[in-house]
């Protein structure tokens, strides 16, 4: 068994392969905690946090005269002004207009870029670069889990209200003006460090990278400079929650498993690829894998550029006026969550699916059904506990007709029929969790009005009818 297609065929289809995979949530191979994940989460809203992104993403370097043409042919983005020191959230679709994935595209030079993200988007671009005659050279630096040689670059992120003061302290003075999602350079410990400007918690920060041999020198300088500014190192447990709080879909299910036009791609992908090992879990169950696919608009990617030809353009044009899903945050009801934890003391299979803190999702692609008046209106994903909000929250894509802020919906937590036989899923029963719709990204004030009601009697988890 060598290819993804062969693995799918042996499993009885893509859905069966994904639902029986023993793999859990995506791995961030750094220290789980440096202090404790609660303080590490709160640092990105109260002081500053240093996050190590050196290990969990794949880097795909592409250089050559056709570099921009390659990405324009396979991306929904506008590339007319893309050049050195620019960056984009690159989004690729299949021929039906469903999202394969997104990754960050860094303009290293006018004809040299670096595509950084989970492996599936680099896989897709590499396949097309090599198979359709583009005048480019491709170099791949695998994520640490797939890389026995070590990474060629480090990648750090400094974010939070005190981040800019810390970065200017490291730089020895004001940082040259870097526009949002553009790139520049700063100096750290005498080293020239490239930087991308973006932000968390409504405060500016920088993503920093350079040669891997300089990583520990740069890290030590950042930690020393941040000593008086409340800098905290963030570990893998805190990092796994950041995307939900900031309103970013860490990964959609890649829309590559059934498109007949992608048969050659599935034959090219190894059976042990990210796409072949990934898992699907949760209460949102369908026999059609297309029901797990999303469009760019569903995810809030409103920057589709129809003024150029790209894979998926015609399908998206035809679907432009169709009803859409809307990305929201769901704030889970406190008492319903408490009831789930209370059920852990019940005998046998009477307990609910355990909610691991701070990230309770237990599959690479978590999908839980969102219900309104008995009708499924979308799905919830990446449920986490936020110490900043003191709430359990999740991202969700729901029918835009029902996506009003403040509205109440229900999430079905846990899998049907006692759970799948994946080793990470204990036998359990499903529970219904009420949730309030909030903006995405979530705002700090949403917790007002959702405080615990101490007079409310304890009750067992409700189960789906």
Which residues fall in each region the model found?
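Conserved, structured C-terminal
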Residues: 1-27, 32, 107-465
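Short, surface-exposed charged micro-motifs
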Residues: 102-105
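Acidic, proline/glycine-enriched N-terminal capping motif
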Residues: 1-89, 93, 98-100, 327
């Amino acid at each position: 068994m060598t290819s993804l297609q062969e693995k799918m065929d042996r499993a009885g289809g893509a859905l069966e392969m994904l639902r029986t995979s023993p793999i859990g949530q995506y791995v961030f191979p750094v220290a789980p905690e440096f202090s404790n994940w609660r303080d590490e989460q709160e640092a990105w809203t109260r002081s500053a946090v240093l996050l190590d992104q050196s290990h969990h993403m794949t880097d795909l370097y592409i250089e050559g005269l056709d570099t921009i043409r390659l990405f324009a042919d396979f991306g929904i983005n506008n590339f007319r002004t893309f050049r050195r020191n620019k960056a984009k959230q690159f989004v690729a679709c299949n021929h039906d207009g469903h999202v394969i994935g997104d990754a960050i595209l860094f303009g290293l030079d006018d004809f040299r870029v670096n595509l950084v993200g989970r492996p599936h988007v680099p896989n897709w671009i590499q396949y097309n670069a090599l198979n359709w005659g583009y005048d480019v050279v491709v170099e791949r630096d695998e994520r640490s889990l797939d890389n026995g040689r070590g990474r060629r670059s480090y990648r750090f992120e400094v974010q939070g209200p005190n981040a800019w003061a810390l970065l200017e302290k490291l730089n020895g003075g004001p940082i040259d003006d870097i526009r949002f999602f553009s790139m520049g350079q700063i100096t750290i410990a005498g080293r020239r460090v490239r930087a991308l400007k973006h932000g968390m918690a409504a405060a500016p920060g920088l993503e920093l990278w350079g040669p891997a041999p300089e990583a520990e020198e740069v890290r030590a300088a950042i930690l020393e400079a941040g000593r008086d500014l409340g800098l905290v190192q963030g570990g893998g447990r805190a990092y796994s929650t950041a995307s939900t709080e900031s309103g970013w879909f860490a990964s959609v299910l890649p829309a590559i498993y059934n498109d007949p036009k992608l048969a050659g791609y599935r034959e090219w992908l190894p059976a042990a690829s990210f796409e072949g090992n990934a898992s699907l879990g949760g209460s949102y169950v369908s026999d059609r894998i297309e029901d797990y696919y999303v469009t760019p608009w569903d995810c809030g990617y409103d920057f589709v550029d129809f003024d150029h030809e790209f894979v998926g353009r015609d399908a998206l044009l035809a679907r432009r006026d169709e009803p859409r899903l809307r990305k929201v945050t769901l704030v889970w009801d406190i008492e319903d969550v408490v009831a789930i934890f209370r059920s852990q003391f019940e005998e046998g299979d009477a307990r609910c699916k355990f909610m691991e803190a701070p990230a309770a999702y237990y599959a690479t692609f978590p999908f839980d059904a969102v219900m309104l008046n008995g009708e499924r209106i979308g799905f919830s994903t990446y449920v986490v506990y936020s110490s900043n909000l003191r709430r359990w929250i999740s991202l969700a894509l729901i029918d835009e007709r029902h996506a009003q802020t403040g509205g109440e919906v229900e999430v079905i937590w846990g899998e049907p029929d006692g759970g799948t036989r994946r080793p990470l899923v204990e036998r359990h029963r499903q529970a219904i969790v009420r949730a309030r719709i909030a903006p995405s990204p979530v705002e700090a004030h949403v917790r007002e009005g959702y405080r615990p009601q101490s007079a409310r009697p304890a009750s067992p988890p409700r189960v789906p009818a």
